[in-house]
Amino acid sequence: MPSRSNGLAAEMEAVRTLALVGPAAAGKSSLAEALLHKAGAIGACGSIERGSTVSDHDPLERRMLHSLNASVMHLKHAGTRIHLIDTPGGPDFLGQSLPALEAVETAAVVINAATGIEPMAVRMMEYAASRHLARMIIVNKIDSQGVSLQGLLADIQAAFGRECLPLNLPDGVNRQVVDCFFNRFGRSDFGPVEAAHRALVEQVVEVDAAFVDRYLEEGDVDPAELHAPLEQALREGHLIPVCFVSSRSGAGVAELLDVIVKLLPDPTEGNPPEFLLGEGAEARPMEVRPDSSLHVLAHVFKVTVDPYVGKMGIFRVHQGTLTRDSQLYIGDGRKPFKVGHLFMLQGKDHVEVSHAVPGDIVAVAKVDEIYFDAVLHDAAEDSHVHLAPLAFPVPVHGLAVEPKRHGDEQRAWEILGKLAAEDPCLRIEHVAATNETVLYGLGELHLRIVLERLREVYRFEVLARPPRIAYRETVTATAEGHHRHKKQTGGAGQFGEVFLRIEPLPRGAGFQFADEVRGGAIPGQFIPAVEKGVREVLAGGAIAGYPVVDVRVVVYDGKHHSVDSKDIAFATAGRKAFMAAIREARPVVLEPIVQIGIDVPEHSVGDVTSDLSARRGVVTGTSDVGAGTVSVGGHVPMAELANYQSRLNAMTSGQGRYTIALSHYEAVPPGVQQTLTGQYRGHEEE
C-alpha cells in the first residue's frame, strides 16, 4: 500500500493551474464556461448576457456584461484537478488580473480571432514573462466570419516570437481542430499538419542535446518521449503553444482540456515563484519546493470583504500540506489562527475540502487579520518571508470624495479601507494641502466601479468631484504694509497699530517671522498676536484663497494704548497689514509641477510629446526601453492632467502608461492667475 506522503505527491502532480488573461471581449469567461461544461463541472454553459456564468457572479459584472474581478474555479479532467482563474481584461482592473499570475504555473493569453492582437494581450504576455511563467496563447472565436487564422498566427509570431507554435490547427470543414503534436498526419485549414508537427518537435528537442542528435539521425521522435524537454521548453519560454478554440461552438475545447492535462506543467515542473526572506536590502532569495511533506508556505493573491460574511483570503499553496486543523501564521504575525474550514471556490460557491497540497488554490473565511500579498506559514521562523513584489501600475487617476451625510467621515474611512483591502491598485489618501479624501485608481472606469460598490454593497453615498489642485501663493518683491485697528463701542475699546515688511524667500524655504520692534512701540506680549494674524492669512490665502508660502515677515514698528490694546486688536492689525503688504509685493499663484514618465509605443511618440507640450508641459527626454516601447520624460502642471489617462489611451490604442511624482512649484501663467484670483473674488463677494 503506498504511503500517505507518496499519495500526496501523486495528488500534487495531478494538479494544473491556469490563469485566463488578455483583453476584454476575447471570450475568457465564455471559454471558462465551456471548459467547466465539457469537464462535467456544470450541467450547461451559462450566458454572459443572462448573467448566468460561474465566473461573473458579481451583480455589477452581470449588469455591465464584463468581468471586474478575478474569479477562481475548479474542474477535473482525466483524473487531474484543474484550478482555473478567469480575469478581467480592462486595463483599469489590472489590480485583479495581475495577482492571478502569482497563483499559477501557466498564463493563457486569450486572443479574439476577430479583433487580433490587442494591447492588453501584449501587456499580459510581458507580465507573465517577467514572472517566469509558462505561457500559451488561446485563439478564441475561430468561427468568426471573415477571419484569416493563418494571418493571425503570422501576426502572433511577429509580435511574440517564432517560438509561438500551434499545438492544433483548425479544420473548418469538420468544425473541429486537429492535433499536430502527437499527430503527424492529417489535414487542416492550413494544409497538411506534418509541417506544424515537425516545427513543434524541432522546437522542443532543441533544449536537449541528446534528443537533437536522435532527431537528426532518425528524422522524428515520438512525442510521448518528449515530456521532460517539453516542460523545460515551456519553463524557459522556448516554446509558447498556440491553441485554437471556439467557446461558442465547442470546437477545440475538449482538445484544450487534453493539452492542459498532458502538456502544461504541474507544480513540480513549473518555475517556482521568487520568495524572499528578510526586508529591504537584507532580503535574500529563499528556496521553496512543491513538497507536500515540508512546512507550509502559501501566498494570498486575493482578498474579498463582504459586509455580511466578513473577510476571505484566497491563496495558492506552494509548499507543505494544509488541513482543517492547521495552525497558520499570517506574515510576521505572532499569533496563529486555526484553519477550521478550508474551501475550494467555484465562482461564488464554496466547496469545503479536507486538505490542500502544493498547487491547490483554496480559501479561508472570517479571518480578519488576513491581507492581500500575505504569506501564510505554520513555522514561526518563516516570518519575514514574502513574494518578490509585482510591478503594479501606479494609481494616479484621482477623485475627491466626502460622505453625503455630515458626521459619516469615520464610517467612510472604514468602508473605503475595506475596498482598498480587495484592490492593490486602489489607494486612499487624505491630502492635507486641500483637506480632501482622495481615491486614486487606474482610470475613470476603475473609480466609477468603486463608487458603485460603495452604493450597492455598503449602501453608502458619497459626493465625488475632481481633486482640488494644491495651488500656493507667494510674493516676488519686498514690500511694506501698515494697518491701525481702532474700535470704540462705548465701553472698553480695541487698539493696535502694526508696521511690517515682507520679503520673498527661496522656493521651499517656508515661512519666517522676525520681531525688530524697538523701544516698546509694540509690547512684547502682543508680538505673538501679530504673528497669529499673519498666520491666518498664510493659511487662508491673500489673492486666490490658497496657502501663502516662502515669505519672511518682519514686524518693525507700531503703536499701542495702555488701556485699549489687546491681543485681538494686534491680531487684526497684523492680518490687515500683511494683506496690504502682499498686494504691493507682486504676488503670484504657484502651481504644482509633476515629473511625468510615459511609456508608449514607438509610433505614438510624436502624438504624445505634442500633446504634452499643449498641456504646458516640457519634454526632458526620450529613451528606448525595448519591445517597441519608448519612455517619454518631462514636466507638466498637475492641473493639466485631468482625465489624462483617457487621452493617452486614445493616442496609444490603450497601450500607454504613465507615472507622476511631485517635482516643484512654479508661477502660473498670467491668464491662469487672473482666472484663479477672479474666482476667489467672486467667492468672497457671495
Per-region residue spans from a language model:
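Structural and coupling elements of P-loop NTPases
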Residues: 1-686
